[in-house]
C-alpha cells in the first residue's frame, strides 16, 4: 500500500479584485487548483482553472442591472478504483511478500516468463505489453500467479483522460418606475462541453488479466440550459389599514444536449500506433466500430400570479394561480398544461387588541 499510494498534495492559487461606489459594485476572482490523487505516478490528477465575475450598477434611479457569471476549465486523469479487478482491489489482496519489481526476466513468475519469451520470439497471440518502468517489470505474486495481478500494471493498462468547460451565470434587470412597483427580468444560463478519451493496447499481467486487442473510445457532450423569468410586484397601502400586494409573472426553461460517443476494439484497428494516431480518426477501413449520438431537447413554460389583501395586519386573504406546460415531445398535446389554483385566509391573533392587553 505504501508503494502504490503517495501523500496527496494540492495546490490552490487565487487572485481577487473588488470595488464599488454609491451606484454599483463589482467582484472578480481567478482561481487555479491542482490536485494529485493518492495513486503514485501521474495517472490520478485533477486540474481546474476558474473565474468569477459579479457586478451590479444603477444606471438610473429607476433601473438597476447586474450579472453574476462563473467560468471553469477542468481536466482529469484517473484509474479504476472500485470493483473486482481494479487496481485498488489488487493492492488490497496482493500478498505482502511480493516485491514491486522484477529487476530481471529470470525473476518472473513461470507463466509470465513463458508469455514474455513468446513475444520475443514472435509466436505470441498478440504483441503484449509487459508493464514496468526503468526499475524493472511490475511483479505478480509467485504463490498464485493466476490470481490478482500487480496493482501498478493495472494502473498503467489504460490511458484515460477527461476534460471540459462550463460557463454559468445570471443576468438581471430591476425596474422601479413608481412607488410600490418593481419589475424584474432575469436570465439564468449554463453552457457546458466535456470530452473523454481512453486507449489500451494488448497487455499481459497474468492468465486472467490480459487482452489480445487494442481498444479505443472517445466521447463528447455539449449542452446549454437557460431560464428566462419576468415578474412584477406591486404593493400599496390605502387608508393606513388596507394592504394590497399583487404579483404576476412567467418563466420559460429550455434544456438542450448533444452526446456523441464511439469505440472500437480488435487485434489490429489503427493505421499506426504512435501517440499521434491513437484516435478514432485513424481507424482502419475494416475496423469494427460503434458510434452513437443522442441529442435531446426539452422546454417548459409557466405563468403564475398571487394577490394578497390584508386589513390592519390582522385579517388576510390570499389567492394564487399557476399554469405549467411541458414540452409536447414529452407529453401529449391534451395533457401538456396543468393548472394549480389555491386560496387561503389568515388571522393574526397576536395583533388583536384584546389579546395584546391580556397577554
Could you describe each region identified by the protein language model?
Residues 1, 38-44, 52-166, 184-301, ...:
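Surface-exposed loop/interface segments of Gram-negative outer-membrane beta-barrel transport/assembly proteins
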Residues 32-36, 317-329, 349:
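Transmembrane beta-strand segments that form the barrel wall of outer-membrane beta-barrel proteins
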Amino acid at each position: 500500500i505504501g508503494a502504490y499510494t503517495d501523500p496527496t498534495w494540492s495546490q490552490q492559487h487565487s487572485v481577487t479584485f473588488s470595488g464599488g461606489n454609491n451606484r454599483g459594485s463589482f467582484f472578480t476572482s481567478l482561481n487555479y487548483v491542482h490536485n494529485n490523487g493518492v495513486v503514485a505516478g501521474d495517472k490520478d490528477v485533477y486540474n481546474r482553472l476558474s473565474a468569477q465575475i459579479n457586478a451590479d450598477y444603477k444606471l438610473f434611479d429607476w433601473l438597476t442591472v447586474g450579472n453574476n457569471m462563473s467560468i471553469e476549465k477542468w481536466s482529469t486523469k484517473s484509474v479504476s478504483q472500485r470493483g473486482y479487478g481494479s487496481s485498488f482491489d489488487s493492492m488490497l489482496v496482493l500478498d505482502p511478500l511480493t516485491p514491486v519489481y522484477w529487476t530481471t526476466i529470470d525473476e518472473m513468475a513461470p507463466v509470465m516468463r513463458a508469455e514474455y519469451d513468446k513475444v520475443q520470439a514472435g509466436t505470441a497471440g498478440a504483441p503484449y505489453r509487459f508493464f514496468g518502468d526503468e526499475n524493472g517489470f511490475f511483479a505478480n505474486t509467485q504463490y498464485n500467479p493466476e490470481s490478482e495481478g500487480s496493482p501498478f500494471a493495472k494502473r498503467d493498462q489504460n490511458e484515460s483522460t477527461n476534460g471540459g468547460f462550463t460557463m454559468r451565470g445570471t443576468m438581471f434587470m430591476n425596474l422601479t418606475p413608481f412607488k410600490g412597483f418593481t419589475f424584474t427580468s432575469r436570465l439564468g444560463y449554463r453552457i457546458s462541453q466535456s470530452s473523454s478519451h481512453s486507449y489500451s493496447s494488448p497487455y499481459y499481467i497474468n492468465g486472467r488479466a490480459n487482452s489480445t486487442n487494442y481498444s479505443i473510445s472517445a466521447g463528447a457532450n455539449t449542452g446549454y440550459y437557460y431560464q428566462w423569468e419576468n415578474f412584477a410586484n406591486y404593493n400599496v397601502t390605502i387608508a393606513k389599514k388596507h394592504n394590497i400586494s399583487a404579483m404576476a409573472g412567467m418563466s420559460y426553461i429550455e434544456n438542450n444536449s448533444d452526446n456523441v460517443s464511439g469505440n472500437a476494439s480488435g487485434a489490429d484497428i489503427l493505421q499506426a500506433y504512435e501517440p499521434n494516431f491513437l484516435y478514432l480518426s485513424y481507424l482502419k477501413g475494416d475496423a469494427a466500430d460503434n458510434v452513437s449520438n443522442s441529442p435531446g431537447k426539452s422546454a417548459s413554460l409557466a405563468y403564475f400570479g398571487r394577490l394578497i389583501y390584508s386589513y390592519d395586519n390582522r385579517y388576510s386573504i390570499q389567492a394564487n394561480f399557476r399554469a405549467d406546460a411541458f414540452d409536447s415531445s414529452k407529453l401529449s398535446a391534451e395533457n401538456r398544461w396543468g393548472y394549480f389554483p389555491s386560496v387561503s385566509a389568515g388571522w393574526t391573533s397576536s395583533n388583536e387588541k384584546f389579546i395584546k392587553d391580556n397577554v
